[in-house]
Amino acid sequence: MPSGEPAVEVDGLVKRFGDVEAVRGIEFTVRPGEIFGFLGPNGAGKSTTINMLCTLLRPTGGVARVAGHDVVAERDSVRRNIGLVFQDPTLDGYLSAEQNLRFHAELYGVPRAAARERMRQVLEMVGLWDRRGDLVRTFSGGMRRRLEIARGLLHSPRVLFLDEPTVGLDPQTRSSIWDYIRRLRDTEQITIFLTTHYMEEAETCDRIAIMDAGRIVALDTPARLKAGVGKDRVRISTDDDQAAIAALRARFGVEAVVAEGAVTFAVAAGEAFVPRLFEGLGVPIRSVSLARPSLDDVFMSFTGKTIRDAEASGDGFMRMVARGRR
């Protein structure tokens, strides 16, 4: 992949299962070295897209290139340049961690001497070198996921695909996995493409594409997406709420209401506004809180529903896709 060439380039990608269009003409580019996330509910088309980019599904239409290679015409070249961590575990529990990696190295034709050194590197990276001889079936869910990531890195891919890398894990283990993912980007000079339906995970990506019902409805950095949704929400507690409301209107041109026992209003750039509030309101403030727009707010602004609501409606969409596969 020449310097400056997109790590992933997608133009008009479509996937149909019978009469059901699971991916509907999406377009996007992933830059080398970035963490790029697909955020959306189950059934949005995220995994179907990854499966096409990894050559596991043939597109119905459109063009996709990964590491400079066409996913249809150059499937072998694509596969040599990618690592893939599936949503569902694919390790052999009756082999040791080292044996699982050795089998993977042989599949990719990694020379034995190079494979031994690379196994040490990736197992140390994910904190499993001391457990390399243990059977995988004795590992916790988080340890297995870390081993899956190590396996995906073994052949030094240009692009690592992670399909819901922390699904089913507890919050502490999810946080640990994300520490490894960020370290990978910094130490391996690799592009990371992941899918998730966890808002807090999408927040850590360099850029995210929000996907709903097979379409990309928004694509940008998390900060810019949230900034485009609306204003920050500020809540203040005072000894005289009505005086505070009048002062906000007169001195700042801000309309406020009393909600849930606090004076509540919306402003742009709330972090910069709060110091001005203390200096110029003229009414004593007991406490203040600031809430910025969330990615769930972004999702709702583009789709008219929360991601949780979309999860429920996506069940019906996935049933249609399943019928289309038959």
What are these language model-derived features?
Residues 102, 106, 113-131:
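Conserved ABC ATPase "signature" region
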Residues 156:
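Conserved catalytic motifs of ABC-family nucleotide-binding domains
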Residues 160-163:
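Catalytic Walker B motif of ABC-type/P-loop ATPase nucleotide-binding domains
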Residues 175-188:
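Helical segment within the ABC ATPase nucleotide-binding domain
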Residues 231-306:
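Short, charged/small-residue-rich alpha-helical element at the C-terminal edge
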